[in-house]
Amino acid sequence: MFSKCIWMEKAKEKPSEFFKSTKTSLKSILKHPEINTRKINDVVIKAHKIVIHTLQFLKMYILHHYQTQSQIIPIIDKILILNVMKVVCGEKHTNQGRLPKKETLELIENLTSFYIEHYKPHTQPEQLDYEYMSNVLSYLCEDIMTMYENNIQLHYVDYVERFVNVVWKKKMMVEKIRKIFPTKKEREARVRQLEKELRKIKNDLLNVDSNVDYTSHPHYHKWITQQKKCILPNKKFQKQSIYYDLKCKPMDYLPCMIAMMKQVENDEETISNVFPLRSSISPGYIRLDTITLVYLLLRKEQGKKRDYCNQGNTKKHEDKIWKFFFRTEKKVFRKNGFSFHHMISTDGVGVSILFIREDLVGKRLPSAKKGVSKELYIDELNDYSKLQDKKVIGIDPGKSDLIYCVDDASKNANVFRYQPHGTQTKTPRA
């Protein structure tokens, strides 16, 4: 009885996720596909082209600003991205809506001037517009901001490591070691020593805690202090941790990444792309909400669009609107503990149906806390005492072996393999 009560209490617990999604094909849920599929595909392709031009324009605009404004870049936010989208599309067909603020008008004028002078001469002429796509553009702005933030959070440390390797000529030093030392054992020892030395330099560069001393050789300390002014933002770091601060305010690190890659480029080495671009010819997913459906799919004989978009009618009739265009009675539109959020993501072929937790329907969502994950990689730990008595297992996923495990680095290590056909093998390494 006691265990049953515990089980019932766990069953009542709210899911940790605010949203969930279910993926299916667009044709399986869309009504009147002979008419509506083409309309949705047109918007998907148009949005894909807008994103391509927006990302390219942003790269050119930010680099130009960096080079002409003393290594200062413009504030990259949704307002800038949205206005870039509008500039690359040209004039809007309809003039409905309130006038932009004075600051926005000045920004648009500046972006338009840059577009005509610098961007347009280097691109193929392409007719784009964003008629009835205001909400779609807003969602795309969020996606582009996420692209920039993810790129910085995931790769900033890699850029620092690349920068150190290039400045201190790691590639050339390794080649010299391989030529000078005759035996393999000596070569490997010298390379390990070099890598250990460079690792200490990288750690010192990434250390923002003033109470922690440098660990590298004193010969490098002056250089490290000088380079920190270029490759770290001039600010107070959250919790004295660069990894935590990267999660909180990643955009502060973009000028630093540009500076590092400029130095790598000057040394005629291969650079990494600081700016996210879209090179795929396959369109990406776009989000469609209720009001976008009305503007895109509602025909004249079915009613006036403004009747569904004024006086709160969009919210009042959202179930009716979605039922009119989609087969919402299907099981795929239901999920236990969640309610259909009246929003989908689609690339014209596949579709992801978005669900929101039932207790959050119609409410303001709790703010998600930004910060580093509680889980750390083993090389990020400061205290290894708890691992001393544990058996360490190395796991490597792959294609031929879904999982490959070893318990030692020697030839006598035990190996556990799980292959695609489902057979498990446990053998000592030969």
Region roles according to the model:
Residues 1-430:
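Nucleic-acid substrate recognition interfaces
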